[in-house]
Design a protein with these regions (language model features):
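Long, low-complexity or tandemly repetitive, helically biased scaffold regions used
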Residues: 1-130
Length: 130
């Protein structure tokens, strides 16, 4: 009974975080490629990275061994260690902030990275499960 309550609590906690990640992804996917869009890209990627770090830290404990929690931990750890666009975003902000093609390419690169290992799809599936 205690383990079931623990899993229900962590699932509710993660549900809010996962919805925030999906909301940020949707914002990035629908964004205009303007200078204002670049500021939004910076904010949303920072938010996603922070939320994935929270998931990774929270699920790093051995007591969370259900399939969807292990999947989330692996996905978040992979993304955090593989992708960091902060330098590229700052570079585009400083030099190419008026170039919609560079902004679009950066945005598409970030969206593609979020779809690496089907992360967004798996997050949606996990939300359907819990």
């Amino acid at each position: 009974m205690k383990i079931t309550n623990l899993l229900m609590d962590i699932d509710e906690y993660l549900k809010g975080i996962l919805w925030q990640i999906l909301d940020s992804y949707k914002i990035l996917a629908e964004l205009d490629d303007t200078t204002n869009g670049l500021d939004i890209i910076k904010k949303q990627t920072s938010k996603i990275n922070g939320l994935l770090q929270v998931i990774n830290n929270k699920l790093n404990e051995k007591r969370y061994q259900s399939d969807h929690l292990v999947t989330l931990r692996k996905l978040s750890k992979y993304y955090i260690t593989t992708y960091d666009y902060s330098r590229e975003i700052e570079y585009v902000l400083e030099i190419y902030s008026d170039d919609p093609n560079r902004i679009k390419n950066l945005r598409i690169l970030i969206i593609n990275s979020l779809n690496d290992r089907r992360m967004i799809e798996k997050i949606q599936n996990i939300l359907d499960e819990i």
